[in-house]
Each structure stands twice: as structure tokens, then as C-alpha cells.
Curated annotation (Swiss-Prot):
GO BP field: regulation of DNA-templated transcription
Pfam families found in the cross-reference section: TACO1_YebC_N, Transcrip_reg
One cellular-component annotation, GO: cytosol
Cellular compartment(s): Cytoplasm
Keyword annotations of the record: Cytoplasm, DNA-binding, Transcription, Transcription regulation
GO MF annotation, one: DNA binding
The UniProt record lists the keyword Nucleus: no
Name listed for the protein in its UniProt record: Probable transcriptional regulatory protein SPH_2064
Family recorded in the similarity comment: Belongs to the TACO1 family. YeeN subfamily.
Species of provenance: Streptococcus pneumoniae (strain Hungary19A-6)
Length: 238
């Protein structure tokens, strides 16, 4: 699958650490997970999963606690998940996942972001068929074979395990991501750099020059939208 997760994680963490918008987005995601189930992460696996991801992105504890406290209250604010697909310059493609309290606003904003920044919105499924839905786990380690065997023994549907420069990357079936995390924790792994459900491109494109500048602007505008939770792309390095 060829993605250099260690480098991508380092870039993302450096950016996320200084980005209050990321904190706000995680706040919404934590609120939704806590509202749907028990506000205690020890009895709500979906909430625990989101909190773990928030910690990986260096979201402060008070942001996490505030979102959980909000879910415990009497607020009836509701959020709806959405997915948009589209195209950028020179064969670049994007999948945009959203979580919003106003679907019409979000749809208009995403469409405008594509239209005003060198992209084109596509129909549902126009891009996603060229991506594979996988669970991705990244942590420090060297022995990919041993990790693969541990996961098989735990009856995890694991697709691949890669070792690169002191980092292990595990790819699982999306339905087995949680099972894999539990199995790895039971084997002694305490800290993860990434625990995500990802849409991984079947092939990547490299952009340079004006095409790269156009794509970066499109990506940045989408990322800055408060309703956009995740962006998947086939552009190398993103």
C-alpha cells in the first residue's frame, strides 16, 4: 500500500498541535460518541476510540472533558454524518467526511470549496471505488512477523503488517480494527501513533508545481471547514 505513515503522522501531529480547529472538530466527535452511548469511555468503546485518536492529535484534556460534560447535559443538538467525493488537478481525488448540525450549509460549503479552488464535485461513489477501507494502526516496533502472528492468534482479520524505521504499521479489515487494538494492548503495546479507519488509495499520484499549489489550496480550504472531519486523498504525502 506504500504509504509512509510515520512521516505523515509526524507532519499531521505538528500541524494539529497548533490548530484549535482540530480541537473543536474532535470536541464534536467526542460529544456525538458520548451522546449516542454511555459518557464513560470504559463502557463505550466508540467513545474510547475517539478519545484515543484525540490524544494522538494532542487534543488537551480539558477539551475532551468539556465535550463529555456537554453530552451529559440536556442539550438536544444533533449532528449528521456525510461524505462528499471530488476531483482536483492532474488526477488527484478527494473523499471528504463531515459531521454537521446543518447538512445544507455543509453541502454548499464543500461544493464551493471544490468549485472555487480548481476542483470538481463528483457523484457519490465516483471516487471511493478507487480506495480501500482499512483499519490502520501505527506504533513503535521492529518485528512485523511477530505482530502478524499475534494478530492471527487473536483471530484478527489482518491484511498486512509492515516495519519501517522502527515503526510498525498494521492494516486490518475495518470491522476488526477494535479487536486488533485490544489484542495489541494485551500483548504489551501501550502507546499508538495512529488508530484510524482510513480510505487508502489503490494507487497514488505525485503533484508538483502549479498543480501541487492548486491541490494544497483546495485541501486547505476543505480542512479549514469546521464541519469537515477527515479528508482522504490519493496524492502522495497527504
Amino acid at each position: 500500500m506504500g504509504r509512509k505513515w510515520a512521516n505523515i503522522v509526524a507532519k499531521k501531529t505538528a500541524k494539529d498541535g497548533a490548530n484549535s480547529k482540530v480541537y473543536a472538530k474532535f470536541g464534536v466527535e467526542i460529544y456525538v460518541a458520548a451522546k449516542k452511548g454511555d459518557p464513560d469511555p470504559e463502557s463505550n468503546s466508540a467513545l474510547k476510540f475517539v478519545i484515543d485518536r484525540a490524544k494522538q492529535a494532542q487534543v488537551p484534556k480539558h477539551i475532551i472533558d468539556k465535550a463529555i460534560d456537554k453530552a451529559k447535559g440536556n442539550t438536544d443538538e444533533t449532528f449528521t454524518e456525510g461524505r462528499y467525493e471530488g476531483f482536483g488537478p492532474n488526477g488527484s481525488m478527494l473523499i471528504v467526511d463531515t459531521l454537521t448540525s446543518n447538512v445544507n450549509r455543509t453541502a454548499a460549503n464543500v461544493r464551493a470549496a471544490f468549485g472555487k479552488n480548481g476542483g470538481n464535485m463528483g457523484a457519490s461513489g465516483s471516487v471511493s471505488y478507487l480506495f480501500d477501507n482499512k483499519g490502520v494502526i501505527v506504533f513503535g516496533g521492529e518485528d512485523a512477523d511477530a505482530v502478524f502472528e499475534q494478530l492471527l492468534e487473536a483471530d484478527v482479520d489482518v491484511d498486512d503488517v509492515e516495519a519501517q524505521e522502527g515503526t510498525i504499521t498494521v492494516y486490518t479489515a475495518p470491522t476488526d480494527l477494535h479487536k486488533a487494538i485490544v489484542a495489541l494492548r494485551e500483548s504489551g503495546i501501550e502507546e499508538f501513533q495512529v488508530t484510524e479507519l482510513e480510505m487508502i488509495p489503490q494507487s497514488e499520484v505525485e503533484l508538483s508545481g502549479e498543480a501541487l499549489e492548486t491541490f494544497e489550496k483546495l485541501y486547505s480550504v476543505l480542512e479549514d471547514d469546521e464541519d469537515v472531519q477527515k479528508i482522504y486523498t490519493n496524492v502522495d504525502g497527504f
